[in-house]
Structures are given as C-alpha cells and as structure tokens.
Amino acid sequence: MICAMRSALCFALTCLASWIQLAAAETCDLLIRGGRVVDGTGSPAYFTDVAVKDGRILALGKLNIPAAATIDAQGLIVAPGFIDVHTHAENIEDLPLAENFLRMGVTTLVLGNCGGSALNVAEFFKKLEAAGISPNVATLIGHNTVRTHVMGGSFMRPPTDEELAKMRSLVEQAMKDGALGLSTGLIYLPGAFAKTEEIIALATAVAAADGIYVSHMRDEGAEIFEALDEVFRIAREAGLRAHVSHIKLSGKASWGRATEVIAAIEKARADGLDVTQDQYTYTASSTGISQLIPETAREGSREEFLAQLADPDKKAKIIGEMKDKLKRGKREDFAYAVIADYDKDTSLNGKNVVEAAKLKRGSDSIDDQIEMILEIQRNGGATGVFFGIDEEDLQRFMQHPNTMFASDSGIRKFQEGIPHPRGYGNNARVLARYVRELKLLRVEEAVRRMTSLPAVTFRLKERGQLREGSRADIVIFDPARIQDRSTFSDPHHYAAGFKAVLVNGVVVVKDDQHTGARPGVIVRRQ
C-alpha cells in the first residue's frame, strides 16, 4: 500500500514538473519560423522553427507558441553565429559596435593573435564589460606583449632565468583571468629573437590550464616546413593543442606545395598531436610595410633605425638584403606590395610601391622602390597589402576538414585607408564564392568550419551549435543573396544578404543594418 502511494506520488510530481516546464516554454522572446537550419555540426540541413528565450535557444521543432517577436525565415538559412578565431580587434574599446564583423555574421571574436594582446587580461575584460560591446569577445595572451614587458628593448637574446620566470608568471595570470591560450608572432619583434625552448617553457603553463598554442609561424614560404616542425615540437613537448594561423604559401617560389603542407600536418595528427589551422580566403596578405625591411635593421628604436640609414655602409647592407630577398622570392620588383594606410601621405594609399616610387621619386627603379619603402618607415611606417598567394593552394587548404575561416582583421574604421577586404567580407566570401559559385564546399561544411569547429578547438562552450540550451548566437542569411562586396581597390563595403544576426538572443543586425545593440559578453576560458 505504502509502495503504491509512493509510486502515485512520484508520478504526480513528474506530471507537475512536466506541466511547469511546458508552461514555461509556452512563450518565448523570439520565434524564427520556417528556416532551413544548418546546425553547425556538418549534418544535413533541415527545416524547422527555433525559439529563443533569455539569451538561449529554448527549443527547435515545429513550434506553436506565443512569441514577443517573430522572424519569417522561409527561404533563408538559420545557423549558429560565426566565430572568428584570428582577429586583431583590440580596438574594440574605441569601436564597440564592431560593425564590419557583425555585418558578415561574426558574433564571437578571438583577440590577442600574432603575439600581441592586452597584458592585463582581467583589466581589459573589465573595461569592455563596462563599456558594452556588440560581439562576444575572447582573447589569447600574446608572447610579444609579455616578452616586451619583461625584457624591454634588450630582446636580441634569450631571457635570463629570472626574466623567463616573470614571463611565465604573466602567462599563468592571464590564463587564470580567462585567456584561451598563448599566441606567437614569430616574424615580428621581439618574438623573432625567441628560441623554441623559451616558447615551450611558456606553453607548458598554458597546457596546465588546458589552453591552446596559436602561432603566426616563423616562415610561410621557403622555410614553411621548418616552421611547422617548430609548431609540432612546441605542441609535443609542452603537451597542448596547437593551431596554425592564416595558413598559406607566400611567394611564387613556394606555390604548389599545399598538398605537402597538409601531409605534414596530417602526419603530426597521426602521431597524436591535435593541430588545426585557419585561413582567410584571399590571395593577398596584410601587415606592416616594415616587413619588407630586414629584421636586423628594425630591431632597435626608431632613432637607431635612422642612424643605420645615415651610415652609408649599413644602409648599403640593408638595401643589398632587400634585393636578395626579392630574388629569393622570384619577384622582379615590389609591385606586389600595396600601401594600405600611410598617415604621412594618404595620397599613396592604394598604390603599390612601384607606383609610389614613380609618383614621388620620378623613377620606378629597384633602388628608388627601396628608397620609397625606407622613406615610409622613416616617417612612421604604414600597413600594406601583399599579393603573393596562389588560388589553387588556397583552395587545397580550404578543403582540409580542420581549416577554419578567420579574417586576420581589426575593426574597420569606415572609409579610412585602403585596407584588406577580408575585414569586411571573409565569411560572406566563403559562402558566396566557394559554396554557392564554385561549389567547393557544402554549406553545412562551411558553416561547421565557422562555428562548431572553432568552438570545440578553442573551448568556447555553449556556442557553435544550434541546440536547446546553447547561447542564442544566430545568423539568418539568404544563400542566394549573401555576398562579400569589399574589394582590394574599393574595400569599404559591408557584406550583404543577412536577414538578422543575433548575439545572446538580441538582434544586432537586421536586414543588413547594425541596430546599435551591445549584448556581447566576455567569453572566458572554462
């Protein structure tokens, strides 16, 4: 009798709990109706409704519940918000709407790449939370930032034991404060002078917190295999996941070797390493014009650089090294390098070095091209766009299942300079050119590379998939109309084709226009 009463009571309580749950689910903040859901896993798309409540996905299915707002998604794709794992969006403090990212569907940005980041991660996060931001933000801790803080201008050497201990302590604190891992920029100063052993020592601190090592490698051209081996060694000896930033083969001398690069990565994975990579979908890169100048000439202060140029012998050595590098890359001149943002003389923005030399020096000889480069650096430097990537290599990297899509961009100031178009169009370009036009990828696979793959790799929990209970970062786009509109010659155009972009359940983009909302949160390592 007692057992029967207990069973009846349990049944009644179960029914009551189910009724309460059903009642709570009878209303939602937003109902997305009739869309073709691409859930981020790579599974085939299917048609269903999506209900959003309190910043999370409440339910998926054929839903008939009251909603405060409704979006008709018939004929449109509904997918998780895109995650960009390689940005330089530290300027989000000044540009919190991050419009170029949101308007191409990116809802979560990973900052701190290429070795450069905020030093005090906790303080940086605190500022962003106080200001309010449109996208979600996570960060890595940058090796160059840490090395500069500890070693100052004396960086052409290994750190002392005491300095290395200080660097490690800073990395450990950043990880405690929520950084996702450690990034390096090994073509930049001061990281270019760091030995592999130094990076391993710092990476072990990251491994202890289940972080990731993310590297702009020492070389992406003739010595790319040696650079990859260094990444693999760091991952192996430190015992952590590794990620190769903006994978590419730079310069004609290296073109056609993408299959070999992929084979090297696959061998490392077969040997037990967890290695992934990202790419931007353009045949040009972008960094400082200073990268055309030898490291040894850039290693000191601006005054020291100017002193080298004033010394005839030292200047002749710099010029000779620049000519040698040009020949090694099988290039005849510097026409591949375009000035993107030069504050000293904006009339040169959009012109390549050959054109700039002809315009300003009256000659486009190699010597005058080099003088033009040195003059730009003498006047404070400029960012540049460098054409040197083969489309066939790009597509081979794209077809690898562990290649993510990342912009390598900061937040754009609209109509300022002639920047690389990737900052406005990278994700939309994947879906327009490589999915719709070239059919190189299925839409389900392309979306997986932008969502669940980066979420799992970088440990961004509750994001990257459309499923009940996950954060409601959602993009709704027209697969027939989605388009990158930014070009190298005319870059300041936002992507098109987005019906809506939601961040934590709040509509941030509506019909290709930013709403001004700032619902973004800090995504800390968990």
Regions found by a protein language model. Give the residues of each.
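Bacterial N-terminal signal peptides
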Residues: 8-21
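Histidine-rich, glycine-flanked metal-binding segment
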Residues: 25-31, 37-81
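Divalent-metal coordination cores built from histidine and acidic residues
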Residues: 26, 73-78, 82, 87-89, ...
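C-terminal cap of metal-dependent C-N hydrolases
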Residues: 35, 311, 395-402, 407-408, ...
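Divalent metal-coordination and catalytic microenvironments
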Residues: 35, 50, 55, 75, ...
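Acidic, glycine-enriched loop/beta-strand segments at the rims
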Residues: 37-49, 354, 381-394, 438-447, ...
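Active-site neighborhoods of metal-dependent hydrolases
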Residues: 140-141, 145, 149-161, 165-189, ...
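Divalent metal-binding pocket/active-site signature
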Residues: 173-231
